[in-house]
Every structure is written in structure tokens, then in C-alpha cells.
């Protein structure tokens, strides 16, 4: 198949540093090519150029990875779906200005590739988008990129790897001595003098993540965060917020969910982080094996390509 992937046009693809959507688009391209498909990436904010580039390529399918491009979707003449990576999709009370984008989704009623069943339900119930227009297509991870060791250099450290901002809430947990932070800084409440590792490059992420005991992600909103799968691929257990558990098997002892009503109980949070870390460093092979279900090639074969085929079939009917 000939497949067009449309990025936000904000950062380069592949990204040189931060950029979860950009690395998702790039890794999707690599995995699709591994399976024999031809892939075009369009990464510009210019709507006319997007349409012209699509028409020049004449794809079998177009996947838009930026929800603010929803007004363009009706002008795409090929089978098409759009994915939102907005972190508050499952928390409509946090939409604020996003309501304008949401209203466009209600108007256009596009095909939507949803990152989780919870997000699919929001589109079906709140947005009144027909179930037949929504498809669950989880994110994957390029497992082979990640260094993996059985004995990490910092088994007594947990890492909070994310952009340091208001949604991620890192500043709340800085009294936890064993918790370290990596990410670009966008929150003046965060104290950079304590356990701050700076912003990591992609190479550092791939090479050094495995040296920590486990990953912590306690945001007040998420949409199937890539960093959780990256951590699993590196052999780390994960401690996540309620919205970070999408597509994870929460019965696994190396996956811990902190209820939102306990998020300010720092003593409880610390105990759960330490408990998860102590289990995780002894069961790295189990974690690494579990991560293989999120390998991009497996995700594409199980979810993504069957969903594309359904959209194409519907387009022709």
C-alpha cells in the first residue's frame, strides 16, 4: 500500500530531541516500510501544500496525526483517518480552548484512529461520532532502539521522563528523594537544583533509560503515552496516573496505577514507587518480554493495517 502520514509541522520528523508525535510518525513509517509499504511523510502547517503533496503521491490511505488539521480532512479525496494526541481527551472538563477543535470533530465526523478504548468512548458518546467511524489503534514502540541491561547502574532511582510542565505535575513529587527528572523545562514551579538531569536527546533516551529502576508518569491527563512503552522496552516497570494506564495490563506487578484521589498523598505515592521499583529490578526479563506486544510491527499487523483496510473498504462502498 501507499500510505501518507501527516505530522503537525511544528518540529522536524524524525525529531532531534523532544517530540513524541514526531517519533511516533517516524517509527510508524519505519515499521510500515519493513512490512513492504510505501510511505510519504508530510510535515507542514500549509494546508494547500498538504493537499497538493497528497494528490501528487496518490496514496491508498492518509493518516492525519494532528487534530488541529481537522478542517482539512473533508478536502482529502483518499481514504483517510485522523488521530488526536491531546492529553485531556478523557477529561472533557479540562478542554478549555480545545472545545473549538472538538466542535470541528462533531461537524466533520471523520474516521478516527483512537489511541485507546476510553478515548473511543469519548468520541462515540460525547462527540456523537458513530462507532463505525472510530477504530482503536494503540501506539507502538521501536523496541530494537532501546539498550537493555539486566543490572542497571541506578537500581535505587526512579525516573520521571517527560516535558516538565503543568500537565505532568513533576513539582508535586520533588520531596521524593529517589525520584529523578529528565525533560525540557516549561514549569517555573519546578526546582531544577534537585535531581534534575536536563533534557535528554533521543540517543541518551535509547542508551540510558535502562539504567534506572522504574518510570514514573503522574500527569493529570494522558492519551496512551509513548514513554510508558519506551520504559517497558528498556526493562523498567511503570508507575502511572489513571489516564496513563491505557492499553496496559494493570494486573502485572510491574505496572502500578496511582488513583487520582491519592495523588497528593506523597507518602503513599513514594511507597508505591519504591514497591514497584523493587519488584521491577528483579523481573527485568519479564518486563522486556511483555514490551514485545507493543513492538510497532506487531501493533501494525494487529490493529493498524486491519483498521486501514476497513476505512478503504468503507470509502469504496
Segments predicted by a language model, with ranges:
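A charged, aromatic-enriched C-terminal amphipathic alpha-helix characteristic of glycosyltransferases
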Residues: 260-268, 274-315
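Short beta-strand->alpha-helix junction loop in the catalytic core
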Residues: 118-119, 136-146, 185-187
Amino acid at each position: 500500500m501507499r500510505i501518507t502520514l501527516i505530522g503537525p509541522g511544528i518540529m522536524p520528523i524524525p525529531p532531534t530531541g523532544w517530540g513524541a508525535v514526531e517519533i511516533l510518525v517516524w517509527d510508524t513509517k519505519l515499521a510500515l516500510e519493513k512490512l513492504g509499504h510505501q510511505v510519504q511523510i508530510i510535515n507542514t502547517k500549509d494546508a494547500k501544500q498538504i493537499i497538493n503533496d497528497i494528490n501528487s503521491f496518490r496514496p491508498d490511505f492518509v493518516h492525519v496525526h494532528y487534530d488541529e488539521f481537522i478542517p482539512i480532512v473533508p478536502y482529502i479525496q483518499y481514504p483517510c483517518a485522523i488521530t488526536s494526541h491531546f492529553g485531556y481527551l478523557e477529561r472533557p472538563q479540562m478542554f478549555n480552548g480545545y472545545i473549538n477543535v472538538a466542535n470541528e470533530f462533531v461537524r466533520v465526523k471523520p474516521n478516527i484512529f483512537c489511541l485507546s478504548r476510553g478515548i473511543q468512548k469519548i468520541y462515540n458518546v460525547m462527540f456523537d461520532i458513530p462507532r463505525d467511524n472510530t477504530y482503536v489503534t494503540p501506539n507502538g514502540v521501536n523496541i530494537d532502539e532501546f539498550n537493555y541491561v539486566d543490572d542497571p547502574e541506578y537500581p535505587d532511582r526512579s525516573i520521571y521522563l517527560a516535558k516538565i510542565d503543568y500537565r505532568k505535575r513533576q513539582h508535586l513529587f520533588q520531596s521524593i528523594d529517589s525520584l529523578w527528572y529528565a525533560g525540557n523545562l516549561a514549569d517555573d514551579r519546578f526546582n531544577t537544583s534537585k535531581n534534575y538531569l536536563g533534557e535528554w536527546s533521543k540517543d541518551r533516551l535509547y542508551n540510558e533509560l535502562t539504567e534506572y529502576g522504574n518510570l514514573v508518569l503522574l500527569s493529570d491527563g494522558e492519551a496512551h503515552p509513548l514513554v510508558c512503552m519506551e520504559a517497558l522496552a528498556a526493562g523498567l516497570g511503570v508507575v502511572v496516573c489513571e489516564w496513563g494506564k491505557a492499553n496496559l495490563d494493570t494486573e502485572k506487578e510491574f505496572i502500578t496505577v496511582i488513583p487520582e484521589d491519592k495523588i497528593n498523598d506523597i507518602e503513599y505515592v513514594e511507597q508505591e514507587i519504591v514497591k514497584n521499583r523493587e519488584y521491577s529490578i528483579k523481573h527485568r526479563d519479564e518486563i522486556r518480554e511483555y514490551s514485545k506486544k507493543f513492538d510497532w510491527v506487531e501493533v501494525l499487523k494487529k490493529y493498524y493495517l486491519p483498521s486501514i483496510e476497513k476505512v478503504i473498504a468503507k470509502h469504496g462502498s
